[in-house]
Amino acid sequence: MKKKSFFLLGVLCTVGFFSCTKNMRHVKDENVDLTEVQSSIFETKSPVSTFFDPTGLISASQHGVLDTIQKGFSFTEGPAVDKNGNVFFTDQPNDKIYKWTAATGQITTFLTGTGRSNGMAFDKDGYLIACADMHGELWKIAPDGSHTVLVNNYNGKLLNGPNDVWINPTNGGIYITDPIFPRGYWDASDPRKQNWEPTHSEQAATGKGGHVYYLAPGSNTLVRVTTMAAWNADIWPNGITGTPDGKKLYVNNWTYDGTGQIKAFDINSNGTLSNMQILVNNLNFCDGMSLDERGNIYVSGGPGLNAYDKNGNKILTIPGGGGTNNVFAGQNNKLLFMTSPDRVTSVKMHVKGVEKF
């Protein structure tokens, strides 16, 4: 009986291996056209180390594995969810925005020629607000793919490079982070350019460091809202999100030396910020963030994703997924959709994301 069992097991494993190999054949080609390709073709279960989830945020049906929706990208970012739970995300080096449809699991190309969009979010009218890094602009993209430029400067100077965006659901005001990640494709001859000094301490001394900006509803002028004395302009503000009541803003900063933080601010009635507090300390490679219905903060960065409660306690770790950004999506708003350099992944959750509309 043992020999027969082992023989049968070997046959099944062999069949399974070639089946998986067949399903994954397209993603080995870096030049594959992902347009109109069913994500179910690529969807696999990726073994990862055990999730840290002491409070049961992840659905029991996930069985401790990370779902890979699709591979073969260059650098995915900016996942934004629409009213139907669909996710739009960028492949920044390839200057494309893709759409994942919640009802079918299909991934299609939404837009080519995106201004190298990075962080994105939908407004209440269904327009996609995108941080277009190519020329330091903030775009408003219509459902048909056409766009208008909302802003392209601060006080007449180029932005460093809009990175991520959050829209206050109570009034439509827009917050963006503007860290200093000098890009080789920026036009150094532009007379509006800021002085990108060699060191961040010099940038801080001249007031040209990373900041957070606010665009009020109906305005075309950015307001710098990180003007408090406690703000250190010698940092890279990166991920940004806020509470559904529009009263609290969270901003993290990207570092590689363990000095990263998640900061919390009170949002004033005029959109300015006050009462800056440090929620979490000693972080690395912080990137995009989202919130769930309990107020927990999900932070992408480095090799995975971590979540923290309102008091800054770590309550979740998902290794291997969500290295750049994350958003709650799906038809029931209980799918954690994560972007990483070469792939998009997901985890079914027990909790819902905050309602954005």
Regions found by a protein language model. Give the residues of each.
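Sec-dependent N-terminal signal peptides
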Residues: 6-14
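Sequence-structural signature of mature extracellular/luminal beta-sheet repeat domains
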Residues: 22-357
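Positively charged n-region of N-terminal signal peptides that target proteins for export
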Residues: 1-4
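C-terminal motif of bacterial Sec signal peptides marking the signal peptidase cleavage site
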Residues: 17-19
